[in-house]
């Protein structure tokens, strides 16, 4: 991985628990910010999600949904903004982590710039429905302006989950 040019963090985290085969109620949202001035040849930033084992040391299978997204802001695709992944589904029971990698495309190809792992997601049949907390609701309303296809109607639906 190249030197750090960006920070990547979860703005809306994956749930702590989910049911196998059912999509997460809310999308996972990542925040991307440059550290200093990114390399001039970066043309586009993309995040992609994969599933890891509980320790985060090995790949796991069973993640499906919209696994890639462009980094966007109010002005379109940018070097600083947000990316929305989802709906995401984990097909089998177990304990996993979501790994999200930030990649930069340039005329020279694509390179991974950063990655972040979620906390453990316990996938089991008895998992409660994921409902946004009041803090998440407030944050989701702020994100409606960020060109991520999140609407007040979506937020209301997630609150009723």
Tell where the protein language model's regions lie, with residue ranges.
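N-terminal onset of structured domains
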Residues: 1-56, 64-68, 86-89, 113-117, ...
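Aromatic sugar-binding surface patches on proteins
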Residues: 76-84
